[in-house]
Amino acid sequence: STDKRKIYLVELQSVPDSPDGDPVIVRGYYAEPQDGQKHPVIMHFYGYDSQNATSWPPCPNGNDSEYAEFFFSIRGQMLNNRAAANRYPDGKEDFKNIYGDWFAYNFGVKDGYYYRGAFMDCVQAVRFMATRETSDMTQLFAEGSSQGGALSYAVAALSDYPFTAIAPCVAFLGDFPDYFNIVSWPAETAKANKGSMTNEEMYAFLSYFDTKNLATRITASVIACSGLQDGTCPPHTNLAPYNNLLTEDKVIYYYPEMGHEIPSDWNKKIMNFFKERMK
């Protein structure tokens, strides 16, 4: 934190893991400008976490006072999956992942699947930002890579507040029937956890969480990217949601030599794209 912008660890309640469960606590780092003015809001969503992770989740700095930002962790991942020693000091206990393999958690249970909760976590995070006096909710943006790209699509599709623009990079969770024919993960996890479901039933279940379908609800401007050598979230799975977007204000960048990674020029590209659409 600085005099320009204060950084807070925020804890908020999100939907239960199942309809009859208890609310789930999720967390993020919130950066609030201190000048008393309203600022554009940028939501940041993380990629797929690691089990027993020890890396420190990114935290915003206090010097960039142009934006109100939320670096948000969905249930069981990142901030919600770190020991106290692997976070910036906050005086709280270890936070533990109770879900095991996130993609497999309650697989096949539409109202209890992991990504149902995760998508709603992101919706709740936007609702939190709307409560802050410094948030200009008429200028709302989201960005993320891999899983974070999928979450950017999901929140733009499902949020109570319309997004101005989003920036999904090498996005996850796209066009499952083709996705599972192209690469082994998460197809192997899905097939190992589908129980008695036929493939047709499995894909019908996954259709609720497919960015290709979520994209049909999105009117925000979109800047996207894909690596043509990506063996985790291949180009086709990125193009499928992009093609289904309602918006005509969209652009996708292809990086011929890039795998599953973030381009070195990506942050500059997306911030220029966002700034061009700010009021």
Predicted segments with their positions:
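Short beta-strand element of the alpha/beta-hydrolase
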Residues: R27-Y30, K38-D49, E69
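Cap/lid segment of the alpha/beta-hydrolase catalytic domain
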Residues: P60-N61, E66-M120, D178-A187
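Gly/Ser-rich "nucleophile elbow"/oxyanion-hole loop immediately N-terminal to the catalytic nucleophile
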Residues: D101-S146
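Short beta-strand immediately N-terminal to the catalytic nucleophile in serine-hydrolase-like folds
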Residues: A142-G144, C169, C225
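Hydrolase active-site cap/lid region
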Residues: L151-T198, Y254, I262-D265
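Short beta-strand/loop motif that positions the catalytic acidic residue
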Residues: I218, A224-S226
